[in-house]
Amino acid sequence: MKKIAVVTGARSEYGLLRWVIDEIHHATELQLQLIVTGGHLSPEQGLTYRCIEEDGYDIDAKVDMLLSSDCASGIAKSMGMCSIGMSDAFLHLQPDMIVVLGDRYELLPIVGTALVMRIPI
């Protein structure tokens, strides 16, 4: 059985990924691994990881990456936190591949970590 880790960091892209998540979840030859990060874990953004749980999905890993600062240095530090957390999550979950969606800087540490760990994206 192939383990597919879907990484979601915001409600906006979760809405688009939900159909992919649902197909993976129901496929008998695939095992869904759900990793949430970014805005999903932010009280200021409504702790939207709860919406994912309300949709009936188990969250396999929560990777905190947000600092209160949105200056360049704060963003760089957040990206570093994300790399560390993703490394731990990938090491624990051992996914066969990851699925991401987006075009923002938050994806850089996710895909960078997967690349270094030789996990197909």
Positions of predicted regions on the chain:
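Active-site and donor-binding regions of nucleotide-sugar-utilizing enzymes
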Residues: 5-8, 14-25, 65-121
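Nucleotide donor/acceptor-binding cores
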Residues: 2
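Conserved nucleotide-sugar phosphate-binding/catalytic loop shared by glycosyltransferases and other
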Residues: 32-75, 85
